[in-house]
């Protein structure tokens, strides 16, 4: 029987790279996306994945998305869940609006919790499963003008580690991938000069690719990582060392 994966934030960037990689490796793939219908449908057609529009900050929408995807594939659970959906907003804390704060926490942290809760309900019954969450190097390292974003990403790491301890006895593994500066739309707010400076600050001397992060996600989700639980795997070229 084919293995299955549910990926959030799947229409672009790291999420899209994950959709393509898991599909290439024979998985039945469902992915949730927030707004870009055109990109989602194009990716779904390319990979034969199921695209579902859903707001991860809304637990009811996520529950409905899981039910729709499980029914579509005729499966009781997903073998792998990738919590990738996220947004960024940088600036001085005094310049962050209430909406900025609510959106960052709602999508990045609450969204990850919502997706995990809905996935775990079925995984516990089956006594198996793997959850991979996407954090950030800013969840591990201090950065000016990234305070709220960093708080959400650090929160993901704390949540994942505690969840790994909680779910380990049920045969469910929970791990985190912590990307550095990656060539995605999310980093388009940075100027070319900023990107160049970040690349120079990275020991490997460049920024990363979405496909490189996807490979790390796939590894942690695979049987090759069967004894890895509660860990944070940095894919940052050594930036956070």
Language-model region placement:
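Substrate-binding pocket helix/loop in short-chain dehydrogenase/reductase
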Residues: 92-93, 97-105, 187, 194, ...
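Residue(s) in the substrate-gating loop at a strand-loop-helix junction
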Residues: 136
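Alpha-helical segment proximal to the catalytic Tyr-Lys
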Residues: 121, 165-169, 226
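Active-site helix of classical SDR
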Residues: 116, 152, 160
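Conserved glycine-rich Rossmann-like NAD(P)H-binding loop of the short-chain dehydrogenase/reductase
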Residues: 25-40
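C-terminal substrate-recognition "lid" of short-chain dehydrogenase/reductases
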Residues: 172, 206-235, 240
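Conserved glycine-rich cofactor-binding loop
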Residues: 11-12
């Amino acid at each position: 029987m084919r293995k299955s994966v549910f990926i959030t934030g799947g229409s672009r960037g790291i999420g899209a790279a994950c959709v393509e990689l898991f599909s290439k490796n024979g998985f039945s793939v469902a992915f949730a996306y927030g707004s870009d219908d055109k990109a989602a449908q194009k990716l779904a057609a390319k990979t034969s994945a199921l695209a579902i529009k859903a707001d991860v900050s809304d637990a009811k929408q996520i529950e409905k998305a899981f039910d729709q995807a499980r029914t579509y594939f005729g499966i009781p659970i997903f073998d792998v869940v990738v919590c990738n959906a996220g947004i960024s907003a940088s600036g001085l804390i005094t310049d962050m609006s209430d909406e900025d704060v609510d959106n960052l926490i709602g999508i990045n942290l609450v969204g990850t919790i919502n997706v995990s809760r809905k996935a775990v309900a079925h995984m516990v019954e089956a006594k198996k499963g793997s959850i991979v969450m996407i954090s950030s190097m800013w969840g591990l390292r201090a950065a000016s003008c990234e305070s709220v974003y960093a708080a959400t990403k650090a929160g993901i790491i704390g949540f994942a580690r505690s969840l790994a301890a909680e779910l380990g006895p049920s045969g469910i593994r929970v791990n985190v991938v912590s990307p550095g500066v990656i060539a995605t739309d999310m980093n388009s707010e940075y100027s070319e000069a900023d990107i160049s400076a970040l690349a120079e600050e990275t020991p490997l001397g460049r920024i990363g690719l979405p496909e490189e992060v996807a490979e790390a996600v796939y590894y942690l989700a695979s049987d090759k990582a069967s004894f890895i639980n509660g860990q944070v795997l940095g894919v940052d070229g050594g930036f956070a060392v």
